[in-house]
Amino acid sequence: MAGNNFGKLFRVTTFGESHGYALGGIIDGCPSGLKLNFEEINNELNRRKPGQSSIVTQRKESDEVIFLSGIFNGLTTGTPIGFIIKNKDHNSKDYFNLKEIYRPSHSDFTYYKKYGIRDYRGGGRSSARETVSRVVAGAIAKQLLKIYNIFIKAYVSSIGNLNFSENYNKLDLSKIENTPIRCPDIKLSEKMIYYINNIRKKGDTIGGIITCNIKNVPIGIGEPVFDKLHAELGKAMLSINAVKVFEYGSGFVGTKIKGSNHNDIFTNNETTKTNFSGGIQGGLSNGMDIYFNVGFKPVATIMNKQKSIDINFFKNQILVKGRHDPCVLPRAVPIVEAMSALVLYDNMLNNRVYKI
């Protein structure tokens, strides 16, 4: 299987399955001498881990990372950083009835057709459980970005039809972690939680939008033409499970605005009066805030009967068991941040070769 690596210079490889012994990763290209803050790494994992509230899956995983290499006396050595996270609370028997039946809108069908075999236990490699490794790597990338005063903040801005249109500059982003939904609008958060709980009781699921803001990115980060910064961010976001939409800057709204109103006019200090460009022009960062939206579909695993087919193309009814997220967005916030950090730091390293 190809496609398990991400990045060019700061390169991450992940491995493992949802119900296997462990998941893990290898980070290659991390500079030596970084004093790792393990508490921050664990905090990022806790933000992603299951069982943290009533509105996410009740699978209980400690998500404790075990580092195997690349670290000595708390400092990175410059060699590959290897790590694993053991799976401790998987009920594979809940999936036995899915052994020969395809779950609608899952990867069951496509994986089986491509490889001729599939791990039906929790989706195997295609499970969002894989993202735990991304969060570990992203947490280290965030610590490296902090050296350059670059900070990444993501939050839930929409669940179903519940959303707010406030610009991120008008929000108190320090409130993101004050509610389990990870939305900075406390009143809207309460409505979102109530809505998700009602969806869950009906055995259904719902999607939404995560907004991400990146501050203090230096001018000129990214590569022209095929490796534009927004293209790299888009690829990163679209690689996350359940993501269907990536929209940066003015996005679809910008298609309805005249150029005379949409152009970002420069000021005397090399900033712009507006930021419809989303902090990126010509594929390179322009020093303004980078911001984008990531749209998540409703989780495909619902707890109601559905029509499907088996591997012999006979019609079947399917009823999924197990513990699943009615809405992935609260746990996806740190994943969006992690993938953003991986893109940014990889491009920061690459940018060093252009000037003496």
UniProtKB/Swiss-Prot annotation:
One of its GO terms (biological process) is aromatic amino acid family biosynthetic process. InterPro entries: Chorismate_synth (IPR000453), Chorismate_synth_AroC_sf (IPR035904), Chorismate_synthase_CS (IPR020541). It comes from the Bacteria. One of its GO terms (molecular function) is FMN binding. Its cofactor is FMNH2. GO terms for cellular component: cytosol. Keywords: Amino-acid biosynthesis, Aromatic amino acid biosynthesis, FAD, Flavoprotein, FMN, Lyase, NADP. Its EC number is 4.2.3.5. FMN binds at R125, S126, S127, N241, A242, G282, K297, P298, V299, A300, T301, R323. Gene3D superfamilies: Chorismate synthase AroC (3.60.150.10). NCBIfam families: aroC (TIGR00033), PRK05382.1 (NF003793). Homotetramer. Belongs to the chorismate synthase family. This is Chorismate synthase.
